[in-house]
């Protein structure tokens, strides 16, 4: 069932939305090969050092894009999440544009108000969420990246393969 904003989309966007909604899994070639990279992100978050978190996150996303044979993503890790009366921003995906030759992901590692390092699982879900936007453009060749049920299932697919598999 489409989300409420679907009915306001133009026909061309509805077509993209429906295509996105049908894709539910991310088919990694070897998720177990990526588990050490996930552990490195966890260790980096524990260190509370932004540079460590950025390096580990970049290495993990590099391996994901290599396995999926798609262009790489530049990962930026920022400190405190921006926020306003409407909420706070956890991550941001910026596709390739005339200005940038590589797509970029920004992920915030500290909570907005308390300035605490975000929980590992929360950080990973945010990182995978932004990676899924990249997959929409580069792997699935969609002209836009909508938050569909399929999109969130793809995010969960990455999470299950790379975080839950490591916790078992």
Task: Report each predicted region and the residues it spans.
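N-terminal low-structure segments adjacent to metalloprotease catalytic domains
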Residues: 1-51
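Short charge-dense sequence patches
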Residues: 2-15, 73-81, 99-110, 161
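Auxiliary, metal-adjacent structural segments of Zn-dependent hydrolase domains
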Residues: 49-103, 166-168
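Amphipathic alpha-helical interaction segments
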Residues: 68-72, 134, 138, 162
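Active-site scaffold of zinc-dependent metalloenzymes
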Residues: 81-121, 134-137, 147-158
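Short alpha-helical catalytic segment bearing the HExxH-like zincin motif
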Residues: 122-131
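A short acidic/glycine-rich loop-to-helix N-cap element
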Residues: 140-144
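Short helix/loop segments within enzyme catalytic domains
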Residues: 158-168
